[in-house]
Amino acid sequence: MVTLSLTPELLAKLQSRQPLLWVNPRLGQPLPASAPSLELIAAAEARLARCAPLMAALFPELASSHGQVESQLMPATGLQYALGEGAEGAWFIKRDDQLPTAGSIKARGGFHEVLAIAESIAIEHGMLDPDGDRRVLATEAARKLFSQYSVTVGSTGNLGLSIGVMAAALGFDAVVHMSADAKAWKKDRLRKRGVRVVEHEGDYAQAVAAGREQALGATRCHFVDDERSALLFFGYAAAARHLARQLAEAGRVVDAAHPLFVYLPCGVGGAPGGITYGLKALLGDHVHCFFAEPVASPCVLVQLASGSDDPVSVYDIGLDNRTDADGLAVGQASHLVSPLMASQLAGVFTVPDDQLYVQLLALKTSMGVEVEPSAAAGIGGPGWLRDSPEGRAYVRDHGLDMRDATHVIWATGGSLVPREELHRFQAYATALAHVPGAMHKAA
């Protein structure tokens, strides 16, 4: 068993699945020399903008947004008061659960990578001028070209939906390797879109490894590597500028006297890591990003707290990576993201499965918003800062005035979840509410 430099107290809490807030002691240190250029964020923004007409042509549900894949920033005063947080600061929900077509945060990175692949192939074959109209990628000639290529990914569910739907829409042979904890409805939805789904008995890492292995032995096959992909990462990072605009439109200033806190559910780390990277590049020390991970799967926490440059997994400390938050059921953090988050991430808090349902129910009853369990992981973030010794110390050490703070809780998925599944989530959460002590807050 690997313990590395985890303190005995932290290790004991992790192994006993005790909810906790870990504050990153390396926040604010320089990025590693190998860090990707921030110019790649602008490149991703530009790609998504020039492909917007193509997206509107491919997906009728994007017509009203002119092909922009973006989500609402929703005031969350109802949730704030339902959880007894008082009036300190302003709360918002970032509604990536409503992102069109893919229904989750994974649309940001997944769509961006598939669009980049399609552009590259079309330019290489003389079908697309570098400055040309991207709607040519939706023509029959383009579909015939793309059908000669496959796009493969390994996923617990939501990234597979994103990649599979986008690749199939363009005519690629789309293959999604899915882990044992992937939900049946996600597999069914992909198959209905013409995507080949390969099921595996192992966990997320094994599904990714299987996809990578298939791609190595194939010609004209692009493997979307959730653990290492820069194209995914910068697709997520491109969300930062739009969020900044939304905050400005809501009258929320972000500066030294008006700090911004962002709470992001975390699986392998690509989506929350990319968004954090983009926000820190844009807003610097004025934004404080925290990841939320299941108590059974705190892979980024374990990796960063270990202080090791070598991969460390939750299995190394005796955890089993079994959680109802299927999108967050990842045992080992991204090899690309972890070194970057070592200096950018404020901290990580962990959430038991029952608490996910408690928070899911609070969101439903206070605001009428229905999400899947993993998407509710970030809701406890403000409470950790207010109520825990670690959170209060973070606020004090950074000289933050919480009265004028803005809190953004990122809801990562849920709009595509079948109605019967949503009812099951709510029923279980309601039953929990009648169990003594079940409604306590994680902090």
From Swiss-Prot:
Please give the biological process terms from Gene Ontology that the record holds: D-serine catabolic process; isoleucine biosynthetic process
Which co-factor is required? Answer: pyridoxal 5'-phosphate
EC number(s) from the headed UniProt entry:
4.3.1.18
Q: Which GO terms describe its molecular function?
A: D-serine ammonia-lyase activity; hydro-lyase activity; pyridoxal phosphate binding
InterPro entries in alphabetical order = D_Ser_am_lyase, Ser/Thr_Dehydratase, TrpB-like_PALP, TrpB-like_PALP_sf
Q: Name one Pfam family in it.
A: PALP
Q: Which UniProt keywords apply?
A: Lyase, Pyridoxal phosphate
Task: List residues modified as N6-(pyridoxal phosphate)lysine.
Answer: 106
> What reactions does this protein catalyze?
D-serine = pyruvate + NH4(+)
Query: SUPFAM superfamilies given for it?
Result: Tryptophan synthase beta subunit-like PLP-dependent enzymes
The family line of this record is: Belongs to the serine/threonine dehydratase family. DsdA subfamily.
Q: Which protein, by its recorded name, is this?
A: Probable D-serine dehydratase
